[in-house]
């Protein structure tokens, strides 16, 4: 498995998601990475309106990067495959447990 986590370059970047009812919610990009195994790029997001004391629900999507590898101008895709989701969860767990990556 080969993934490259892009934590630093995604700082201070936000994405607005729109739900089925048309409600908009602003999200911060936690990090992005690319999986050679799945041939896809992924973005992990958390709500922008969360305080430091709140539990945070991280959302993950695959995306089609533009020519610069940017996620903010591309469509997000739900992850529906269990094996793919387990891979993304493993990358997130590694990120959260590694102080050098998470910035803690």
Swiss-Prot record:
InterPro entries, alphabetized: EF_Hand_1_Ca_BS, UPF0473
Signal peptide from the UniProt entry: none
NCBIfam families on file: PRK13678.1-4
Family under the similarity heading: Belongs to the UPF0473 family.
HAMAP family, sorted: UPF0473
The protein, known as: UPF0473 protein LJ_0477
């Amino acid at each position: 498995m080969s993934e490259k986590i892009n934590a630093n370059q995604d700082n201070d970047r936000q994405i607005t998601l729109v739900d089925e009812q048309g409600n908009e919610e602003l999200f911060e990009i936690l990090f992005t990475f690319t999986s050679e195994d799945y041939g896809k790029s992924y973005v992990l997001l958390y709500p922008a309106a969360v305080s430091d004391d709140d539990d945070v629900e991280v959302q993950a999507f695959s995306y089609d990067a533009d020519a610069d590898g940017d996620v903010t101008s591309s469509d997000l895709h739900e992850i529906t495959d269990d094996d793919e989701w387990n891979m993304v969860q493993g990358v997130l767990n590694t990120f959260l447990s590694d102080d050098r990556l998470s910035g803690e």
